[in-house]
Amino acid sequence: MDLSYLRSVSKFLTILGLIAVLLLAPAAHADEEPPADDGGNGEEASQIEDYASYEPQTTCHPKPRVGTRVLAEWLTSELGGGGGATGRACGGGASEHKDGRAIDWTLNATSQADRKIAKAFLKAVFATDEEGNTHALARRMGIMYVIWNDHMYSAWDEFERDGYLSSSCKSKRKCSKTLRHRDHMHISLSMAGAKGKTSWYEGRMD
């Protein structure tokens, strides 16, 4: 049997295992006690967030915000791929890259191994948790939308899979692999997620 195929399968199973651990294990240490003050609403501090609404760039913050960096570093260190949180100068059109809320996670859509990583990640973040919360991990991470391999998944549409074509392209055929997001996965966060203020970041901000 092809050894490269076996290695690919082994890596994919390892990734699935890591994601399963992430879904099942709380971020905070087990010996930490929950805060005594729940804000007066009888809800735990880690209550799941609602779906992120669309928040366009309105401020200039060209350096990635702390939550953006934490999520980007987790993606590359635990799941593979490259790239990460990316900032951009604030001139020109609007972009979440320009206010520190965007990740460009380097994955190659022509690579079977990278497609498996992307598929496993999307399956995990869009899964329903044990409490019945749909798209639970994406909501806890503060994911606003994802673009990957000619498709977009938006929180305000409950992460329905929609076709995507960059406004800079007349057709897929005339569109670059970067604008088609076939050489990276773009992840935009809500401002709360980018600042590390949603529940997934609890215990991960040290």
Model-flagged regions — what are they?
Residues H151-K172:
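Short, low-order "capping/linker" segments at domain edges
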Residues L165, K172-M191:
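Conserved, short, structured surface segments that act as functional micro-motifs
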Residues C90-S95, K170-K177:
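Catalytic micro-motifs at enzyme active sites that drive phosphoryl/nucleotidyl and oxygen chemistry
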Residues R182-D206:
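Low-complexity, Gly/Ser/Thr/Pro-rich intrinsically disordered linker/tail segments
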Residues A30-N41:
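Cleaved targeting-peptide boundary
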Residues D2-D31:
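Secretory targeting and sorting signals
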Residues M1-Y5, D99, R140, L179-D183:
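A short, structural micro-pattern
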Residues G40-A155, S188-L189:
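Secreted/periplasmic proteins that engage bacterial cell-wall peptidoglycan
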